[in-house]
């Protein structure tokens, strides 16, 4: 789903109005109906709460893709492996530990790489939801502001290159660590 659409939907869920400063969004309406006080979700004094809301939005946005990847990986496991494990007397935990988990390790590695890359270069959700205010500024938002608000295009380009280098280094480290773990043999011990 488009990150802009998701951000606008959740902005209305947490806050109402264009400025985002009034705590009368859908969630606070529910809290008030339950007899609780409304909460200012995106507040300058509580950047932790604002960042938790952004994490929740990001998880909601990407969880469908992640689940589809894992379901596809699990369904690609040969039924013969499960049959052999049943004949050997494996319980469900052993099936998971020795058949499912080793079979989906490459997908877990890919998902971790995509998650870290996305976390490093996150832009649309915090920018649309909070405009990068209230302690939610990311490196990419800072880069965009440097380029367009401060008119320092050269500095913004250098910041983009630094982000690219950091992303490549982190990806190589993750790939190296995942190759070490994937190459380790696992034996079924009953």
Identify the meaning behind each predicted range:
Residues 1-179, 183, 187:
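A structural signal for multi-pass alpha-helical bundles of membrane permease subunits
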